[in-house]
Amino acid sequence: MEASAKLTFARLSPRKTRLVVDMVRGKGIQDALTILRFSPQASAKLVSKLLRSAVANAEQKGASDVDRLYVKSISVDGGPVLKRFVPRAMGRASKIRKPTSHITVVLADKQ
């Protein structure tokens, strides 16, 4: 049985978030949450929250044993980029890019 969860429009850089996501891909739920708990990256907190949401979704779907779940797939896609301007000297302006991410998690039972 599979359960999934999505986080959309997260104000995180997709490039930096992929570094965190790669650490937990294919791991068991307890191992993944432990890795994320001790990870210093800002995206680790949101990814662990998303994993817990996926586990809750699995329980709602009727998963018999939550401890047997593992991260089957987890992906980070780029969302829209918020563009802002900051004033600079002599009437100029510089562009500030604020990237967003879409994170998708799929959990499955170990066979």
Curated annotation (Swiss-Prot):
Tagged with keyword Hydrolase: no
Keywords: Ribonucleoprotein, Ribosomal protein, RNA-binding, rRNA-binding
Ribonucleoprotein listed as a keyword: yes
GO MF term set: rRNA binding; structural constituent of ribosome
Domain of life, per lineage: Bacteria
InterPro entries, alphabetized: Ribosomal_uL22, Ribosomal_uL22_bac/chlpt-type, Ribosomal_uL22_bac/org-type, Ribosomal_uL22_CS, Ribosomal_uL22_sf
Database matches in CDD domains: Ribosomal_L22
Biological process annotations from GO: translation
Any one GO CC term of the record: cytosolic large ribosomal subunit
Subunit description: Part of the 50S ribosomal subunit.
General function of this protein: This protein binds specifically to 23S rRNA; its binding is stimulated by other ribosomal proteins, e.g. L4, L17, and L20. It is important during the early stages of 50S assembly. It makes multiple contacts with different domains of the 23S rRNA in the assembled 50S subunit and ribosome.
NCBIfam families hit by this protein: rplV_bact
Family of the protein in this entry: Belongs to the universal ribosomal protein uL22 family.
Protein name listed in UniProt: Large ribosomal subunit protein uL22
Organism: Geobacter sulfurreducens (strain ATCC 51573 / DSM 12127 / PCA)
Gene that encodes it: rplV
